[in-house]
Every structure is written in C-alpha cells, then in structure tokens.
Amino acid sequence: MTLKMKNILFISGMLILFLLLWSVTLFADVPKGFTGYGETTAISPDDETLVFSYYHDGDASLYAVPVDGGEATLLAQPEEGTSYVNPAFSPDGDMIVFIKQWQEEEQPYGELMLMGAASGEKRALTSGYNLITEVVFSPDGGSLYFLQAGVFQNYSDIARERPHDFDIHRMDLHTNETEQITNKEAYDMSSLAVTPDGEELMYRSYEDSDRIIFMSMENNRETSPVPIFDVASEAPILSSPALSPDGEQVIFSDVASKDENGTFIYEGFRMDLDNYEAEQITNFQEHVTEPVFFHHSDRLIVTVDKQFAQRESDYQYWEVSLDGTEQRRLHIEIPEGKEL
C-alpha cells in the first residue's frame, strides 16, 4: 500500500470517527435518564446572562445564570419526553428562540419556539413534524434563519442514523412566512451564523471535507476560508465554528493532540478572517467545543466535555480570554441546590 493511500485511509477513518461521535450529541441524542448540562449556550447582548440547557432524566429544560456563575433560574420546562435546546438571544435581548425536540417511534423532530426573556411566555413558531436543528436571529431582529433536515437516516452501514439533506430557511417574524433560501440537500450543516451587516450567512458543512462557508445573501456566492495552522489530525476538522460580533474572527474546535489511548483532543483555535491565520487559544487537554463570544469584551464561553468519546458526556462551561491566557470554570447551582 502506498503512503498516499495510507494517508487517504487514515483521513477518511478519522472523519468517519468524528461524524460518529458528533452524532451522539446531535439532536439531543443523550442516554436514557441522562442528567447534566447541555452542549450549547447563549450569552445575552448585554453580556450579563448565560442561557443553557440542563437535562433531568433525559429531558432538557432551559435555565439562565449570571455569566460569572451562581444560582440558576428555570426559564422553561418542557413536558415529559421533550427537550428545549440550542437557545439564541434576539439582538435587543428581549426574546429567546430555541428548538423543541422530541422523538416518536425513534424518529426525531424539532420545531421552533420563541420565548420572552423576562416574561417567560413562549409560543410555537412552526408546527407539524419538522426536523429543525439550529436557529439564529438576523442582526435587525426581524427574521430567523434556521437549519432544517429532510431525512433522518444513515448513508453508511457503519454510521448512525442522523439528520441529512440540510437546507437553510428564513422566517419573517412579522408575518411568520417562511422561505427556503438554499437548495443543497446537504449531507451535513451546522453552526449557523449571520454576519453583523446581515449580508452573509456562515455555516459549517461536510461533503468531501470539513469546510467553513460564507454565503452571500444577495447571490448565494460562497467562499470557504481555509485556516493556516498546524493541525494534529492531518486534515482539519473545523468543528463548531463561531463568528465574532465584529465579523473579523472565527473560533473553532479542532484536533490539537492525542491522549495516551489515541483519542483525539480538541482545543479552541482562533482564525483571523483577514489572512486566515489561526492559532490555538486553549489548552484543556480535553474536548473543547461550542465557543460563544461575549459581545463587549474579549472573552468566550466554551463547553468542555470531560468524558469525550464515552457513553455519557460530562459538560462544563468555562470562561476563556480571547488570547488564551486566562480561563475560569463557571460554577452553577441548579435550583435543587446541587452545584455541578
């Protein structure tokens, strides 16, 4: 076997492994009875509040806590067998949009929900049996952009069933009218974001390789920046990219090293969109994912999985300075009084 073929097989195997592990957390696919933090968080526009999901016996409720940690407040608790996940704030901080997830006959579903940040009043924005996975506000707060999958299946005998045939949709919040703005039926889409000027969408996609894509709202033209950095996995993974509030940087997670068992260790990397140069900014020696920017300071919240590649994740939330010199764990008290 030639060296080139060995490299191709190694890279292909690595990407398949990543997709298998990624599918474990996608769409609230958590072990039955799981209790603990969800993977994603949202920071309010005034940088005062962190909203997150917390699972009780497999069902996720939404909580809010000061960004420095402390006692959490229950925002929304779903009915049994349902989870509230992937929250996002409106630009003025008055509203929170999130995904309501559930399963029927092993088929997952996801619908859009909107809630008043202060009142807690919530309403469904979509109905039926859709497969919506992520949602973000437009910069003016008048629209939502969301990812919707067309099928839930496996395209390989060794892969788990998961959402495929993705496209991006837009909802006008004044009329509730929805339009599909891409026609890709993509194998994978995630990490949806809107540039500050509202002229482009950013998302992560996987077809033949992992890519961060910027798509023009005017003509659907796409650009795909390739970060310049030393990656330990032979080929970039570019997991969970997050766009900075000024639109000038992207933080993403990628393989930095391996542990003694050969498991990939994912750290946070910062890419400058002017020159695509990237540098590692975390050193947890764990699995770092889902970075979220503060709006008015050079800080991030990242999620660290202490049990990556195991049956159950053990997520913690950490505050990290943008230059990577400081990091601090958020200690949160869930209303039952137990600090986790």
PLM features: residue spans?
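Sequence signature of WD/YWTD-type beta-propeller architectures
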Residues: 2-340
